A protein has these predicted regions:
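Helix-to-loop junction immediately C-terminal to a conserved catalytic motif
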Residues: 56
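Conserved ABC transporter NBD signature motif
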Residues: 64-73
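Conserved ABC ATPase "signature" region
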Residues: 72, 119-137
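ABC ATPase NBD coupling module
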Residues: 73-89, 119
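Conserved ABC ATPase signature
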Residues: 142-146, 150
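A short, proline-enriched helix->beta-strand linker immediately N-terminal to the Walker B motif
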Residues: 161-165
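Catalytic Walker B motif of ABC-type/P-loop ATPase nucleotide-binding domains
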Residues: 167-170
Protein backbone atom coordinates (compact mmCIF):
# COMPACT_ATOMS: atom_id res chain seq x y z
CA UNK A 1 0.00 0.00 0.00
CA UNK A 2 1.33 3.40 -0.97
CA UNK A 3 1.88 5.52 2.19
CA UNK A 4 1.49 8.69 0.08
CA UNK A 5 -1.39 8.08 -2.33
CA UNK A 6 -1.95 10.66 -5.07
CA UNK A 7 -4.35 13.49 -4.34
CA UNK A 8 -7.98 12.76 -5.19
CA UNK A 9 -9.37 13.71 -8.56
CA UNK A 10 -12.82 13.88 -6.95
CA UNK A 11 -13.42 14.36 -3.25
CA UNK A 12 -16.90 14.42 -1.75
CA UNK A 13 -17.30 15.33 1.92
CA UNK A 14 -20.50 15.06 3.95
CA UNK A 15 -22.71 15.67 0.90
CA UNK A 16 -26.46 15.86 1.44
CA UNK A 17 -28.64 16.47 -1.58
CA UNK A 18 -32.22 16.18 -2.74
CA UNK A 19 -35.23 17.93 -4.20
CA UNK A 20 -37.18 20.67 -2.42
CA UNK A 21 -37.36 19.62 1.23
CA UNK A 22 -36.83 15.93 0.41
CA UNK A 23 -33.37 14.65 1.35
CA UNK A 24 -32.37 11.85 -1.03
CA UNK A 25 -28.70 11.52 -0.07
CA UNK A 26 -27.36 12.25 3.39
CA UNK A 27 -23.78 12.62 4.58
CA UNK A 28 -22.11 10.95 1.57
CA UNK A 29 -18.31 11.01 1.53
CA UNK A 30 -15.80 9.39 -0.83
CA UNK A 31 -12.67 10.10 -2.83
CA UNK A 32 -11.58 8.93 -6.27
CA UNK A 33 -7.88 9.03 -7.06
CA UNK A 34 -6.21 9.09 -10.49
CA UNK A 35 -6.85 5.95 -12.55
CA UNK A 36 -9.53 4.72 -10.15
CA UNK A 37 -13.02 3.83 -11.32
CA UNK A 38 -16.03 4.23 -9.06
CA UNK A 39 -19.30 2.41 -9.67
CA UNK A 40 -22.39 3.48 -7.75
CA UNK A 41 -24.76 0.53 -7.63
CA UNK A 42 -28.22 0.43 -6.10
CA UNK A 43 -31.86 -0.16 -6.68
CA UNK A 44 -34.19 2.03 -8.66
CA UNK A 45 -34.85 5.32 -6.89
CA UNK A 46 -32.00 5.00 -4.39
CA UNK A 47 -30.29 8.25 -5.44
CA UNK A 48 -27.68 7.30 -8.05
CA UNK A 49 -28.84 9.91 -10.56
CA UNK A 50 -29.33 12.45 -7.76
CA UNK A 51 -25.70 11.94 -6.75
CA UNK A 52 -24.61 12.54 -10.35
CA UNK A 53 -26.68 15.72 -10.53
CA UNK A 54 -25.04 16.99 -7.33
CA UNK A 55 -21.56 16.09 -8.59
CA UNK A 56 -21.95 17.99 -11.86
CA UNK A 57 -23.74 21.00 -10.41
CA UNK A 58 -27.28 20.43 -11.68
CA UNK A 59 -28.45 20.23 -8.06
CA UNK A 60 -27.17 22.42 -5.25
CA UNK A 61 -26.25 20.33 -2.21
CA UNK A 62 -28.06 21.00 1.07
CA UNK A 63 -24.67 20.63 2.75
CA UNK A 64 -21.19 19.27 2.14
CA UNK A 65 -18.59 19.82 -0.54
CA UNK A 66 -17.63 18.42 -3.93
CA UNK A 67 -14.05 19.14 -5.01
CA UNK A 68 -12.23 18.38 -8.26
CA UNK A 69 -8.42 18.32 -8.29
CA UNK A 70 -8.44 19.97 -4.86
CA UNK A 71 -10.71 22.86 -5.91
CA UNK A 72 -14.15 23.19 -4.36
CA UNK A 73 -16.85 23.00 -7.01
CA UNK A 74 -19.55 23.68 -4.44
CA UNK A 75 -18.00 26.98 -3.28
CA UNK A 76 -16.70 28.07 -6.69
CA UNK A 77 -17.95 31.21 -8.40
CA UNK A 78 -19.32 31.05 -11.97
CA UNK A 79 -15.97 31.44 -13.83
CA UNK A 80 -14.30 28.85 -11.57
CA UNK A 81 -17.18 26.42 -12.03
CA UNK A 82 -16.92 26.85 -15.81
CA UNK A 83 -13.21 25.98 -15.68
CA UNK A 84 -13.93 22.90 -13.57
CA UNK A 85 -16.76 21.83 -15.90
CA UNK A 86 -14.26 21.65 -18.77
CA UNK A 87 -12.45 18.82 -16.98
CA UNK A 88 -15.27 16.31 -17.25
CA UNK A 89 -17.67 14.75 -19.69
CA UNK A 90 -21.16 13.48 -18.87
CA UNK A 91 -23.29 10.81 -20.47
CA UNK A 92 -26.86 11.05 -19.27
CA UNK A 93 -29.25 8.13 -18.95
CA UNK A 94 -31.34 9.41 -21.87
CA UNK A 95 -28.20 10.35 -23.89
CA UNK A 96 -29.45 13.97 -24.21
CA UNK A 97 -28.82 14.33 -27.93
CA UNK A 98 -30.48 17.29 -29.65
CA UNK A 99 -32.97 15.80 -32.11
CA UNK A 100 -32.76 18.78 -34.50
CA UNK A 101 -28.98 18.47 -34.84
CA UNK A 102 -26.84 15.97 -36.74
CA UNK A 103 -24.41 13.75 -34.86
CA UNK A 104 -21.56 16.01 -35.97
CA UNK A 105 -23.35 19.04 -34.54
CA UNK A 106 -24.17 17.20 -31.29
CA UNK A 107 -20.59 16.02 -30.77
CA UNK A 108 -19.24 19.46 -31.66
CA UNK A 109 -21.28 21.27 -28.98
CA UNK A 110 -18.70 21.07 -26.14
CA UNK A 111 -15.94 22.09 -28.55
CA UNK A 112 -17.89 25.18 -29.60
CA UNK A 113 -18.78 26.04 -26.00
CA UNK A 114 -15.41 25.49 -24.32
CA UNK A 115 -12.72 26.05 -26.97
CA UNK A 116 -11.72 28.54 -29.63
CA UNK A 117 -10.83 25.85 -32.17
CA UNK A 118 -11.38 26.51 -35.84
CA UNK A 119 -14.28 24.81 -37.59
CA UNK A 120 -11.82 22.52 -39.42
CA UNK A 121 -10.19 21.46 -36.14
CA UNK A 122 -13.59 20.82 -34.54
CA UNK A 123 -14.66 18.73 -37.55
CA UNK A 124 -11.45 16.69 -37.30
CA UNK A 125 -12.07 15.97 -33.61
CA UNK A 126 -15.72 15.09 -34.25
CA UNK A 127 -14.72 12.62 -36.98
CA UNK A 128 -12.07 11.08 -34.72
CA UNK A 129 -14.42 10.70 -31.74
CA UNK A 130 -17.22 9.21 -33.84
CA UNK A 131 -14.71 6.77 -35.34
CA UNK A 132 -13.43 5.82 -31.87
CA UNK A 133 -16.95 4.79 -30.81
CA UNK A 134 -17.71 2.88 -34.02
CA UNK A 135 -19.83 5.54 -35.75
CA UNK A 136 -17.49 6.54 -38.58
CA UNK A 137 -19.38 8.00 -41.52
CA UNK A 138 -22.48 8.84 -39.49
CA UNK A 139 -21.76 12.55 -39.02
CA UNK A 140 -24.82 13.70 -40.99
CA UNK A 141 -27.32 11.34 -39.35
CA UNK A 142 -29.90 12.62 -36.86
CA UNK A 143 -30.56 10.93 -33.50
CA UNK A 144 -33.96 9.69 -34.75
CA UNK A 145 -32.09 7.60 -37.34
CA UNK A 146 -30.08 5.71 -34.71
CA UNK A 147 -30.66 2.66 -32.54
CA UNK A 148 -30.48 3.03 -28.76
CA UNK A 149 -26.93 1.66 -28.68
CA UNK A 150 -25.81 4.02 -31.43
CA UNK A 151 -27.28 6.97 -29.50
CA UNK A 152 -25.35 5.89 -26.40
CA UNK A 153 -22.13 5.73 -28.44
CA UNK A 154 -22.83 9.17 -29.96
CA UNK A 155 -23.31 10.54 -26.43
CA UNK A 156 -19.98 8.94 -25.48
CA UNK A 157 -18.28 10.63 -28.45
CA UNK A 158 -19.65 13.98 -27.30
CA UNK A 159 -18.56 13.37 -23.70
CA UNK A 160 -15.03 12.57 -24.89
CA UNK A 161 -14.76 15.48 -27.34
CA UNK A 162 -12.75 17.64 -24.92
CA UNK A 163 -10.54 14.74 -23.77
CA UNK A 164 -11.85 15.10 -20.22
CA UNK A 165 -9.97 13.96 -17.14
CA UNK A 166 -13.21 12.58 -15.68
CA UNK A 167 -16.22 10.99 -17.36
CA UNK A 168 -19.53 10.50 -15.56
CA UNK A 169 -22.01 7.91 -16.80
CA UNK A 170 -25.65 7.63 -15.73
CA UNK A 171 -26.79 4.07 -16.50
CA UNK A 172 -23.71 3.39 -18.66
CA UNK A 173 -24.70 0.06 -20.17
CA UNK A 174 -28.35 0.88 -20.91
CA UNK A 175 -29.07 0.46 -24.60
CA UNK A 176 -25.64 -0.90 -25.54
CA UNK A 177 -25.27 -4.05 -27.57
CA UNK A 178 -23.12 -6.77 -25.93
CA UNK A 179 -20.58 -6.56 -28.76
CA UNK A 180 -20.13 -2.77 -28.67
Amino acid sequence: MNPNPPAPVIEVKNLSCGYGATVVLQDVSFAVRPREVLFVIGGSGCGKSTLLRCLIGLLKPFQGDVAYFGKSFTAADAPQRRDILKTFGVIYQNNALWSSMTLAENVSLPLEEHTSLSRADREEIVTLKLTEVGLAGSEELYPSELSGGMKKRAALARALALDPAIVFFDEPSEGLDPIT
